[in-house]
Amino acid sequence: FEADYPGWLGCVAHVGLLHLAQARITERIARQVGDDTFAEQCAEWVRLGAQAMEDRLWDERGYYLNFFDPVKGIKSEFIFGYQMDGQWVTDHHGLPSALPADRVRTTLETIKQTNVALSASAATNYAMPDGSPIRKKKEGTWDYGRFSYFPPEACMLAMNYMYEGEVDFGLDLARRMWENVVCTHGYTWDVPNIMRGDTDTGERVFGSDYYQDMILWSLPAAIAQQNVSAPCQPGGLVDRVMRAAAK
């Protein structure tokens, strides 16, 4: 994940699901403009992509492999804690999931028992299948460290749980992450990009003033298990803020 080790090759769970989410969005756009032929093509791409993820990446231990390159015969069995980002995209856009519901629930439960359990403030980028921290980087390569994570990714993961009905768990995960950023380390107006990985202190290792952390404002819709349009409707959060500002 943006690092030499373990790297991403071939079929990648995180990237694959994001592409399927993009195809879902494009399918809806095509239907809205009356291009049913292209919409059906997008739907078929989603079906085929989801089947490829099932056939090549699903691991019976309850998650999608980090990656699998069928040409080179190389795979990474690390559990990527944020592999469900594409699921958040479809949920937040009010679109059908690209993956079977039981796979989504099982994967999130696995991440809860591994990546989330390894971090005092969010969820580690990676975990071993047995729930232990990943091995240290290989000689001559670099990585972010065994306990690293990105705050906006943690927000998306929290919303994954909310959209799957685990609102309290998702809220607590988001709270722990923001409490670490704002209260523990005082990064309130200097929001970080990535947290320290060599030890589980929750300190920033890189980045400041990262606007991707404004994903915070996506939480109200997820808490209510609504899509992104809901806060903009009459009486929604955005509508109330704008009316209050006009007074």
Task: Tell me the role of every PLM-derived stretch.
Residues 1-9:
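Aromatic- and acidic-residue-enriched carbohydrate-binding clefts of CAZyme catalytic domains
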Residues 6-7, 16-17, 21-32, 36, ...:
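Active-site core of glycosidic bond-cleaving carbohydrate-active enzymes
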